[in-house]
């Protein structure tokens, strides 16, 4: 009798079974790489499919293990430049303080674009870090082994951050004297 449906499913499987037992038949696609401060590394999503059937749509993966160069770029841009990293490397806090000082100078001069952009900052870090540094653990391990002279080379100077040269401090004083009164001046 072929008029009746006898079974809706003949062989139900769990996706994990196919992923574990058939790795040679699986297609993997990686997407959405981003910096995860809590994990201290670049993470992404992996879509796993078997002959077009999606078994795992968004499996979290350590992106740096798969694509170290791209992870290194993201690490420099989203972790180091922004300071969104929990690191023991002391240069980063000093660089962020120097950047704040440069932004203050930019406000004094009332000139947008006085400070180097984030792309320059990221490239500056990339030029000084070895290729294997693309996560917090690797940064801390590498930085911890550096001699003091090499650690100092990772710190920005004020002149590094200013595009148009250093300002004239006399033109933009931090204090203004009116008679016997000394007033603090803030530039916005």
Identify the residue ranges that each predicted region occupies.
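C-terminal accessory domains/tails appended to large, multi-domain proteins
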Residues: 1-188
């Amino acid at each position: 009798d072929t008029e009746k449906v006898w079974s809706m499913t003949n062989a139900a499987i769990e996706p994990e079974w196919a992923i574990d037992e058939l790795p040679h038949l699986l297609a993997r696609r990686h997407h959405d790489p981003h910096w995860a401060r809590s994990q201290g590394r670049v993470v992404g999503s992996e879509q796993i499919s078997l002959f077009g059937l999606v078994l795992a749509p968004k499996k979290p993966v350590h992106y740096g293990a798969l694509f170290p160069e791209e992870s290194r770029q993201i690490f420099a841009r989203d972790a180091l430049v922004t300071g969104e990293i929990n690191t023991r490397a002391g240069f980063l806090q000093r660089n962020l303080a120097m950047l704040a000082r440069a932004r203050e100078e930019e406000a004094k001069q009332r000139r947008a674009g006085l400070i180097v952009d984030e792309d320059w900052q990221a490239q500056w870090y990339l030029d000084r870090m070895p290729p294997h540094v693309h996560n917090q653990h690797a940064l801390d391990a590498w930085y911890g082994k550096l001699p003091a002279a090499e650690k100092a080379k990772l710190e920005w100077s004020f002149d590094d951050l200013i595009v148009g040269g250093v300002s004239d401090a006399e033109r933009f004083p931090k204090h203004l004297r009116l008679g016997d009164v000394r007033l603090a001046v803030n530039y916005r």
